[in-house]
């Protein structure tokens, strides 16, 4: 039960951080491309790869990996934004966003893992 509560506590902080970045992006970045979600998901992928490479206790992994980074990253928002660009026939943004999100996420999770193994 303590692990579930730990993950939930971490998720609160991850969601607060995501909310802050998303609102900052709405005020300061172009609305033509979902920069905030891309930034959130790519940094989250890197950090999760890093966390995964380290020998943390299950408690810390639940707090940071499952909790904070689970609350921070947003797979569902990514896919809704992709659908929106497809629906609006904005195929160039759709393609670029999909490639950067999925390809970049995969590259950054491996890079985060590699950095974590070197430290």
From Swiss-Prot:
<keyword id="KW-0812">Transmembrane</keyword>
<keyword id="KW-0915">Sodium</keyword>
<dbReference type="GO" id="GO:0046872">
    <property type="term" value="F:metal ion binding"/>
</dbReference>
<dbReference type="InterPro" id="IPR003691">
    <property type="entry name" value="FluC"/>
</dbReference>
<dbReference type="GO" id="GO:0062054">
    <property type="term" value="F:fluoride channel activity"/>
</dbReference>
<keyword id="KW-0407">Ion channel</keyword>
<keyword id="KW-0472">Membrane</keyword>
<feature type="transmembrane region" description="Helical">
    <location>
        <begin position="1"/>
        <end position="21"/>
    </location>
</feature>
<dbReference type="GO" id="GO:0140114">
    <property type="term" value="P:cellular detoxification of fluoride"/>
</dbReference>
<keyword id="KW-1003">Cell membrane</keyword>
<keyword id="KW-0813">Transport</keyword>
<feature type="transmembrane region" description="Helical">
    <location>
        <begin position="56"/>
        <end position="76"/>
    </location>
</feature>
<comment type="function">
    <text>Fluoride-specific ion channel. Important for reducing fluoride concentration in the cell, thus reducing its toxicity.</text>
</comment>
<feature type="binding site">
    <location>
        <position position="70"/>
    </location>
    <ligand>
        <name>Na(+)</name>
    </ligand>
</feature>
<keyword id="KW-0479">Metal-binding</keyword>
<feature type="binding site">
    <location>
        <position position="73"/>
    </location>
    <ligand>
        <name>Na(+)</name>
    </ligand>
</feature>
<dbReference type="Pfam" id="PF02537">
    <property type="entry name" value="CRCB"/>
</dbReference>
<keyword id="KW-1133">Transmembrane helix</keyword>
<feature type="transmembrane region" description="Helical">
    <location>
        <begin position="93"/>
        <end position="113"/>
    </location>
</feature>
<protein>
    <recommendedName>
        <fullName>Fluoride-specific ion channel FluC 2</fullName>
    </recommendedName>
</protein>
<comment type="similarity">
    <text>Belongs to the fluoride channel Fluc/FEX (TC 1.A.43) family.</text>
</comment>
<dbReference type="GO" id="GO:0005886">
    <property type="term" value="C:plasma membrane"/>
</dbReference>
<feature type="transmembrane region" description="Helical">
    <location>
        <begin position="33"/>
        <end position="53"/>
    </location>
</feature>
<keyword id="KW-0406">Ion transport</keyword>
């Amino acid at each position: 039960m303590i692990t579930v509560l730990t993950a939930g506590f971490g998720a609160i902080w991850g969601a607060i951080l995501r909310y802050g970045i998303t609102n900052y992006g709405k005020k300061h970045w172009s609305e033509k491309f979902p920069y905030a979600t891309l930034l959130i998901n790519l940094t989250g992928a890197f950090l999760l790869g890093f966390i995964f490479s380290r020998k943390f206790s299950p408690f810390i992994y639940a707090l940071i990996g499952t909790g904070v980074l689970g609350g921070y990253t947003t797979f569902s928002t990514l896919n809704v934004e992709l659908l929106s660009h497809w629906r609006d026939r904005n195929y160039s943004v759709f393609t670029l966003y999909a490639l950067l999100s999925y390809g970049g996420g995969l590259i950054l999770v491996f890079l985060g893992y590699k950095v974590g193994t070197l430290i």
